[in-house]
From Swiss-Prot:
Protein family according to the UniProt entry: Belongs to the universal ribosomal protein uS14 family.
PANTHER family: 30S RIBOSOMAL PROTEIN S14, SMALL RIBOSOMAL SUBUNIT PROTEIN US14M
Region Disordered, annotated ranges: 51-70
A GO molecular-function descriptor: structural constituent of ribosome
A single cellular component GO annotation: small ribosomal subunit
Protein's recorded name: Small ribosomal subunit protein uS14
Stored Pfam families: Ribosomal_S14
Source organism phylogeny: Bacteria, Pseudomonadati, Pseudomonadota, Gammaproteobacteria, Enterobacterales
Record's subunit section: Part of the 30S ribosomal subunit. Contacts proteins S3 and S10.
Record GO biological process: translation
Organism, scientific name: Salmonella arizonae (strain ATCC BAA-731 / CDC346-86 / RSK2980)
Function field: Binds 16S rRNA, required for the assembly of 30S particles and may also be responsible for determining the conformation of the 16S rRNA at the A site.
Amino acid sequence: MAKQSMKAREVKRVALADKYFAKRAELKAIISDVNASDEDRWNAVLKLQSLPRDSSPSRQRNRCRQTGRPHGYVGKFGLSRIKLREAAMRGEVPGLKKASW
């Protein structure tokens, strides 16, 4: 089980990424625009650097919804491999069954 502070930190990162998504996209568009002046592009780089570090979506870590475990995350279900196996063995995941060949 992950610490509550780690789970809260991830929630904060998601909220910040949502809040600054449009602003970051706008600045990145200016930076990648070859027709923009060098000064405008440089100012956009500086503004992008001044945004909160956690507002970048790449800082987010996928975590299990039940335990907060960061490793062994199965994205289709939003669970770690351990909790996914437990749920599958209880028959709580429709269409998922134990492999047998």
